[in-house]
């Protein structure tokens, strides 16, 4: 458990989750390509999605959040993006770690959006099961347990 705690502390140490960080809304394929280039240069990014499941067989992607190790965050306005091929490049890149919590739904909808199978995924929820914590733990509970931080959702 000590190694996992260390990893989580590294991921959270710069205020990316709790501090004051800059964000930028991405609404074009060109801006998405720039964000992907920054993600690849960083070597690791946190990814989360927001989607709507209303009167459809599949969920509709609404927002993709990308967090960088320096604390910066990109918000991708999914309906505004016409060409997801830059994001497909990121998802398929084996040299960039994609960090998600409870990744299954996120990965399913991202695969539908960009068409790429993800490589080099780190799922914080699944990892908990390997270190003696619940493999179904919420992100809020995980942060409370390991970091003694209360996350308002």
Which ranges hold each PLM region?
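N-terminal accessory regions of nucleic-acid-interacting proteins
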Residues: 3-45, 49
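Active-site-proximal helix-loop-helix substrate-binding element of RNase H-like nuclease domains
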Residues: 11, 18-22, 65-153
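Short, flexible, glycine/charge-rich loop motifs used to bind or transfer phosphoryl groups or to couple energy/partner
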Residues: 34-36, 54, 86-89
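Short, surface-exposed beta-edge/turn micro-motifs
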Residues: 42, 60-61, 95-96
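An N-terminal structural lobe/cap that precedes and organizes the functional/catalytic core
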Residues: 50-69
